[in-house]
């Protein structure tokens, strides 16, 4: 009996319980407005995240572009500075007028930029053979006895053998004591260690720059003169990728705009071989300073009693002293070369919107450099300009063991 009563009480309790919300509820769900508000908040968070990522990505792309032109300009500066310091190294100082020649505002590439060019001679491999006789008809040079014994070079071909004489570019200088401003540029075709002779082919007319060498002259003027190896280099900028005489894929020419090259004369192919030093270069300018009137004092070219950057001249400028650049003493007196390299990003800055103001035109437009004018239009390409001055400090450097040059 008691057991039945307990069971009835349990059933009564169970029947009086409310169902769990899992099975049914009188509470209402989210309204449409609440759903829209929640979705809007979530969308705003997503959009803000994407906007932050996009902005960060644009900054990263722009920074990468700028870092790239910085690297290019600095690399070009390094090679150019090194070579300028070595102009005329190992060559007779009496012929220093022929060691470098500039082109101011070379217009071969066309507007809107007219960059400068610089061609110069140097000699990194020691060779100075004293001439006993010279036969211009056969281009045969006979040297004093035992001249070949002083150097490690062989009768093989260069560059297959880095110590070979054959195919090397040489310059034949007359006796420096005669003050005869002549010279012959050629490549060695044969060498005879028994007769102390070399034979060469002239390349005077093939070398793009005559460098005031004035080939020819009396054969007797060359007795006591010298024969040395030379390197003939030109630094230049291809503005538009269609430089006259350039053929894409030939001799290293890329055919792309804004490429700075160093070109070296190859006597084997009788042509310049081009090495691209830097991409995305907009302008290249050279200026010169020294004792160009041979008065044993640095020239105050703007007559302000101060020697500074304002005294540098563009190639061919007369300055306050009315220099005549056809006079040998003018190029011979150059002791410093100032060079300016302007880099330009390959693409406009994607993180920059609107039009650049006048205050930042020098950043997003081409500035004036030396005598190269500025551009009025700001094209949103970022610029990077480096300027340096190199002293031609190795001009009288002796690279031989037999005394001074």
Labelled PLM ranges:
Residues 55, 132-133, 350-352:
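Short, solvent-exposed loop/turn and secondary-structure capping segments
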Residues 2, 11, 60, 135-137, ...:
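Short secondary-structure boundary/capping segments
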Residues 27, 68, 75, 91-94, ...:
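Short linear sequence signals and composition-biased patches located at protein termini or domain-edge surfaces
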Residues 42, 169, 185, 338-339:
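Beta-sheet entry/capping signal
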Residues 28-89, 391, 397-403:
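Aliphatic-rich helix starts adjacent to a transmembrane/signal segment
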Residues 1-30:
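N-terminal leader/signal peptides at the extreme start of proteins
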Residues 52, 56, 257-258, 288:
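A short secondary-structure junction motif
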Residues 107-211:
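Autoprocessing Asn-cyclization modules and mimics
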